[in-house]
C-alpha cells in the first residue's frame, strides 16, 4: 500500500534527501503536503515535481508568492501559511506518514499533532523530544502513533536494538558516535576566533547552517543524548558519546553478554531516511555500498569537554530534568543565530547557554504551555545576555 507523506521542512537538507528517496520509489510513496518557512522558490519547484495537495509556508507574503507561481504553472496545490496550517497538515486524514524535519522549536507543535493523530512519524526534529520528551512520548503511546527515528545515530541504534523495550533486551548501554566536527583537533584557546563559515564546514556530512554549528560545538550530540533517553527509555548514565572521525559507524549498542552491535554505512542521510520510510522493509536509497577496504582505518576517542562545553551543558540539563532541556535548546537557538549573524563569537554560544541555565529557575512543567513558556523565557534571557556581550573580534583574513 502506497504511503502518503506530509514532509515538514521540505526545503532543508533532510527534505531534499527525503524527496530524493521518494522519487526513486513512486510506487511506494506519494506526497500529500510539503512545507517550508520562506524558501518559496524552492518549494514551488518541489510542488511542480511532486504535486502535493497542500503546500504550507511561514507567512502570508511568501504564500502569495508561491500561490502565484503555482497558479501560473497550472498547479492545483492549495497554499496555506502559518503555524496552525503546519498542525493541520500533520494531523490530516490525507496523510498516514509525517516526516518531521523542521529545524528548531517551530517543529514541536506539528510533530506533537502528528503523534496525537496516531501517525507514523519519521522524526528528524530534535526539539519535540528535547523540549517536551515526556509529553511527546506519552502522546505516541496514548494515540498509537509509530515513532521511527531519522537522525543517523538514533536510526542506527534502532536497527541494532531488539524490538522489545531496552530493559528487557539485555542492553548494557548505547553509544552515540560523533565526528567531532571541524574543530576536533583545534586547541580550545584558538576557537575564540572561529568564523561562521569555518563552523559550517563539516568534514563528513552535508547539513544546514544551524545544525552544522551545533555539530561544531557538539551541542548536536548533547541534544541527541537527550533524544536517545526518551526514544529508548535509557537513563543518561547508560548513554555514552564516542568521537569517531570517519563517520562510518553511526552508533552502537552494548549488551550485557559483552556483545556490541554497530550499524555502519557511508555518511549519507538517505540511508536512515529510506530505512524509516520503508520500515520494516528495505529499499534502494541511492547510496553507494560501503567499502571498508578503501576506508582501511576506523578510529575512536573520548570527547574533550574543555573543547566542547556545550556537550557537557546538555548532559547536565538531562540530569537536572524539568525545563532545563527546553531552556538549553532555546538559549542555544538564540545564541547560534547570533553567532551566524556575527553578533557574538563562537565560544560565546556555550557561555550564553550556561548563563541562561544558571539564571532560569528549574521546575517541572505542568504541560505543553509550561514548556513553551520556559522556551520563551529562556529566549528572552539569552537575547539580553547577548545584547550585553562584547562584540566578536574582527574576522581575520586568511
Swiss-Prot record:
Keywords: Isoprene biosynthesis, Manganese, Metal-binding, NADP, Oxidoreductase. It catalyses: 2-C-methyl-D-erythritol 4-phosphate + NADP(+) = 1-deoxy-D-xylulose 5-phosphate + NADPH + H(+). InterPro entries: DXP_reductoisomerase, DXP_reductoisomerase_C, DXP_reductoisomerase_N, DXPR_C, DXPR_C_sf, NAD(P)-bd_dom_sf. 1-deoxy-D-xylulose 5-phosphate binds at residues 126, 152-153, 179, 202, 215, 220-221, 224. Its cofactor is Mg(2+); Mn(2+). NADPH binds at residues 11-14, 38-39, 125, 127, 208. Pfam families: DXP_redisom_C (PF08436), DXP_reductoisom (PF02670), DXPR_C (PF13288). Its EC number is 1.1.1.267. It is an enzyme of class 1 (oxidoreductase). Mn(2+) binds at residues 151, 153, 224. The keyword Ribonucleoprotein does not apply. One of its GO terms (molecular function) is 1-deoxy-D-xylulose-5-phosphate reductoisomerase activity. SUPFAM superfamilies: 1-deoxy-D-xylulose-5-phosphate reductoisomerase, C-terminal domain (SSF69055), Glyceraldehyde-3-phosphate dehydrogenase-like, C-terminal domain (SSF55347), NAD(P)-binding Rossmann-fold domains (SSF51735). One of its GO terms (biological process) is isopentenyl diphosphate biosynthetic process, methylerythritol 4-phosphate pathway involved in terpenoid biosynthetic process. Belongs to the DXR family. Catalyzes the NADPH-dependent rearrangement and reduction of 1-deoxy-D-xylulose-5-phosphate (DXP) to 2-C-methyl-D-erythritol 4-phosphate (MEP). This is 1-deoxy-D-xylulose 5-phosphate reductoisomerase. The lineage of its organism: Bacteria, Pseudomonadati, Pseudomonadota, Betaproteobacteria, Burkholderiales.
Amino acid at each position: 500500500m502506497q504511503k502518503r507523506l506530509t514532509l515538514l521542512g521540505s526545503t532543508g537538507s533532510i527534505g531534499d534527501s527525503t524527496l530524493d528517496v521518494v522519487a526513486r520509489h513512486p510506487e511506494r510513496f506519494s506526497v500529500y503536503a510539503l512545507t517550508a518557512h520562506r524558501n518559496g522558490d524552492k518549494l514551488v519547484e518541489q510542488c511542480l515535481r511532486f504535486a502535493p495537495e497542500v503546500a504550507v509556508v511561514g507567512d502570508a507574503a511568501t504564500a502569495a508568492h508561491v500561490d502565484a507561481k503555482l497558479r501560473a504553472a497550472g498547479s492545483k496545490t492549495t497554499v496555506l501559511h502559518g503555524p496552525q496550517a503546519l498542525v493541520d497538515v500533520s494531523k490530516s486524514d490525507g496523510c498516514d506518514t509525517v516526516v518531521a524535519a523542521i529545524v528548531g522549536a517551530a517543529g514541536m507543535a506539528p510533530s506533537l499533532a502528528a503523534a496525537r493523530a496516531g501517525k507514523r512519524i519519521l522524526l528528524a526534529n530534535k526539539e519535540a523530544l528535547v523540549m517536551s520528551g515526556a509529553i511527546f512520548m506519552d502522546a505516541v503511546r496514548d494515540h498509537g502513533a509509530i515513532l521511527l527515528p531519522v537522525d543517523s545515530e538514533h536510526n542506527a541504534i534502532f536497527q541494532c536494538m531488539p524490538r522489545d523495550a531496552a530493559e528487557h533486551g539485555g542492553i548494557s548501554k548505547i553509544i552515540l558516535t560523533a565526528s567531532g566536527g571541524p574543530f576536533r583537533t583545534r586547541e580550545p584557546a584558538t576557537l575564540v576566533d572561529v568564523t561562521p563559515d569555518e563552523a559550517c564546514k563539516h568534514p563528513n556530512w552535508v547539513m544546514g547552517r544551524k545544525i552544522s554549528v551545533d555539530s561544531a560545538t557538539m551541542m548536536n550530540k548533547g541534544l541527541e543524548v537527550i533524544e536517545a533517553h526518551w526514544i529508548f527509555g535509557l537513563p543518561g548514565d547508560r548513554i555514552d558519546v564516542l568521537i569517531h572521525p570517519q563517520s562510518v559507524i553511526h552508533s552502537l549498542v552494548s549488551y550485557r553478554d559483552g556483545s556490541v552491535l554497530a550499524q555502519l554505512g557511508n555518511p549519507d542521510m538517505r540511508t536512515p531516511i529510506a530505512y524509516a520510510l520503508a520500515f520494516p522493509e528495505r529499499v534502494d536509497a541511492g547510496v553507494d555500498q560501503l567499502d571498508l577496504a578503501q576506508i582501511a582505518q576506523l578510529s575512536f576517542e573520548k570527547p574533550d569537554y574543555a573543547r566542547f562545553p556545550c556537550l557537557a551543558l546538555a548532559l547536565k540539563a538531562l540530569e537536572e530534568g524539568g525545563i532545563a532541556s527546553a531552556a538549553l535548546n532555546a538559549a542555544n537557538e538564540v545564541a547560534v543565530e547570533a553567532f551566524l549573524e556575527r553578533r557574538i563569537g563562537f565560544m560565546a554560544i556555550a557561555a550564553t547557554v550556561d548563563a541562561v541555565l544558571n539564571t532560569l529557575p528549574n521546575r517541572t512543567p505542568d504541560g505543553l504551555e509550561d514548556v513553551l513558556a520556559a522556551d520563551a523565557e529562556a529566549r528572552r534571557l539569552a537575547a539580553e545576555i547577548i545584547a550585553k556581550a562584547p562584540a566578536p573580534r574582527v574576522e581575520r583574513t586568511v
